């Protein structure tokens, strides 16, 4: 994390990762499925997960390549701009499948759920979870860094929406995907056909919930943020 273009501190993170860490701290059984390099950064992340009660048994720990790193640059309003660096092996996401039961919750999203190199295995896992009658929660978390790929990735985005029992995303996510920020238009034009349950977060303007029975707006309490990193993940 950088403030005034100077490194401030480094911590493990990522959208779904942050959500599971919060659940682990609350004592909720949580398993993280992803890929991590067999290196110092990877060791730090695994140790952090264990200390926060998140299961690491289903990680793919690879030897050829390096654990990915994200840089977050905070502006004067503590809003974050991101840059990503990675070096993955040719063969990806060779994880041990977890036990999935009815009403378990599967959270998936971000570019990880759209990446062509991982797409087949992500779909296999989500389809298996649906067969087991798990609840599928999709958080697009579609950042500015991938906005130029929106058209190319759209078939996978729409397929993810169709998988989902609940879609949650920020107005910024959907602006990057569909060039729309109005929650009603996002739901009516882009979400409802695929998934009836939708939550749109609007930062300081609150949260809008849509479902088959109607919609409702929830106001937020004004705060001065320390930073916006992981705000949506905390909402999850």
Where are these regions (language model features)?
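A short, aliphatic-rich alpha-helical micro-motif
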Residues: 99-101, 160-161, 192
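Residues that scaffold the ATP/ADP-binding catalytic core of kinase and kinase-like folds
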Residues: 4, 83, 104, 177, ...
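Hydrophobic anchor at the start of a short beta-strand
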Residues: 30, 56, 134-136, 198, ...
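Glycine-rich phosphate/adenosyl-contacting loop at the front of the ribokinase-like
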Residues: 1-55, 224-226
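Conserved phosphate-binding/catalytic region of the ribokinase-like
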Residues: 127, 183-236
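Conserved beta-alpha-beta core of the PfkB/ribokinase-like small-molecule kinase fold
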Residues: 111-188, 196, 206-207
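Short, conserved phosphate/pyrophosphate- and ester-handling motifs at nucleotide-, phospho-/glycolipid
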Residues: 23, 170, 232
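Conserved N-terminal subdomain of the carbohydrate kinase-like
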Residues: 29-110
């Amino acid at each position: 994390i950088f403030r005034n273009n100077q490194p401030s501190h480094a911590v493990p993170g990522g959208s779904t990762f942050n959500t599971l860490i919060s659940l682990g701290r609350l004592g909720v059984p949580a398993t993280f499925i992803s890929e991590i390099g067999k290196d110092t950064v990877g060791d730090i992340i695994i140790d952090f997960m264990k200390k926060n009660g998140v299961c690491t048994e289903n990680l793919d720990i690879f030897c050829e390549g390096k654990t990915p790193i994200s840089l977050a640059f905070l502006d004067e309003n503590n809003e974050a701009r991101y840059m990503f660096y990675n070096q993955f092996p040719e063969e990806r996401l060779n994880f041990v499948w977890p036990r999935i039961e009815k009403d378990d919750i599967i959270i998936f999203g971000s570019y990880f759920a759209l990446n062509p190199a991982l797409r087949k295995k992500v779909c296999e896992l989500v389809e298996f979870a649906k067969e087991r009658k798990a609840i599928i929660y999709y958080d697009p978390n579609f950042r500015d860094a991938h906005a130029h790929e929106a058209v190319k990735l759209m078939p996978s985005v729409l397929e993810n929406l169709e998988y989902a029992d609940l879609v949650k995303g920020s107005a910024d996510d959907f602006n990057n995907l569909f060039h729309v920020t109005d929650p009603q238009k996002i739901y009516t034009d882009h979400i409802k056909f695929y998934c009836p349950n939708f939550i749109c977060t609007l930062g300081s303007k609150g949260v809008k919930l849509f479902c088959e029975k109607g919609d409702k707006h929830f106001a937020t309490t004004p705060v001065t943020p320390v930073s916006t990193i992981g705000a949506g993940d905390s909402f999850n």
